């Protein structure tokens, strides 16, 4: 008996107006993730995935390119307003926010969510260069 052909349903992109941009700026890399209000990821990009390797990965320009790539990916969702959550001490903190602003998003709120220990784990030893 022949199987009936299964038609693939066309995926409809849902229209989302408000989103949250999570920026993880470490000393070595910058990760930009744009989610909806519930935390479901819509798009993400990294400085390393944007073609930068080694020490160039940890530059503000690499973070800017990653933010531009991520912004380009979420344009199809109709995103207009962004709330920005910045985590980490890296060099890509400010340039990422500037790039998202230049991409045409209205930034409603900027929050620093860098985890600060209340005397938790011992930090790594100081570098001797």
Swiss-Prot record:
Belongs to the universal ribosomal protein uS11 family. Part of the 30S ribosomal subunit. Interacts with proteins S7 and S18. Binds to IF-3. It comes from Glaesserella parasuis serovar 5 (strain SH0165) (Haemophilus parasuis). Gene3D superfamilies: Ribosomal protein S11. HAMAP family: Ribosomal_uS11. It holds the Pfam family Ribosomal_S11. One of its GO terms (cellular component) is ribonucleoprotein complex. Located on the platform of the 30S subunit, it bridges several disparate RNA helices of the 16S rRNA. Forms part of the Shine-Dalgarno cleft in the 70S ribosome. One of its GO terms (molecular function) is structural constituent of ribosome. The gene is rpsK. Keywords: Ribonucleoprotein, Ribosomal protein, RNA-binding, rRNA-binding. GO terms for biological process: translation. The keyword tRNA-binding does not apply. This is Small ribosomal subunit protein uS11. The keyword DNA damage does not apply. SUPFAM superfamilies: Translational machinery components (SSF53137).
């Amino acid at each position: 008996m022949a199987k009936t052909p299964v038609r693939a349903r066309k995926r409809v992109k849902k229209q989302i107006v408000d989103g949250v941009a999570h920026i993880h700026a470490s000393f070595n890399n910058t990760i930009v993730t744009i989610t909806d209000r519930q935390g479901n990821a819509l798009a993400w990009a990294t400085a390393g995935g944007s073609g930068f390797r080694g020490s160039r990965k940890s530059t503000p320009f690499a973070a800017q390119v990653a933010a531009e790539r991520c912004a380009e990916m979420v344009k199809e969702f109709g995103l207009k307003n962004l709330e920005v959550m910045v985590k980490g001490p890296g060099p890509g903190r400010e340039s990422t926010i500037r790039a998202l602003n230049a991409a045409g998003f209205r930034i409603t709120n900027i929050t620093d969510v860098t985890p600060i220990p209340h005397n938790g784990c011992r930090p790594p030893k100081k570098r001797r260069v």
